[in-house]
Amino acid sequence: MAAPYHGTTGSGTYFITACTFQKQSLLQSDRMAGLFLEVLFNYRSQGKYLLHEFVVMPDHFHLLITPIVTLERALQLMKGGFSFRARKELGFSGEIWEKSYYDRRVRDWEEYLAFQKYVRLNPVRRGLAKSGEEYRYSSAGCGVRLDAVPQRLKPSSLSA
């Protein structure tokens, strides 16, 4: 995958995909996936981004986020913060992430719902769960409270 230009501001909502180095199943273990979620929630609680949906798969993750900082900075914090902690706390050595990531700005309510469905069903498509709610490394399955959908994406009938 060619590295796209990531010149973004913190004003949009984005669908993100980031892969582990050479698509290795580095996030397959409970320790690694759990640590990634800790890092994800930590930067969210620091106000770096709003988190609308997520799933951590064995070799990649998907997010629906609205960055408060730039999108580039949000991904740098997540990936870099996780790498630092995985090396320090779990003794991991070697490359963890591919350098690039995929981002798509969410334009409207229909697109938001399509990405939300994609994120929630990703573990089902990969045979890791029978439903999104059964997969604990996802917003559908771990019971965490998510940030609200930005008003600008909601149809006028839902904005009131």
Identify the function of each model-found stretch.
Residues 1-160:
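Short catalytic/metal-binding and nucleic-acid-binding patches
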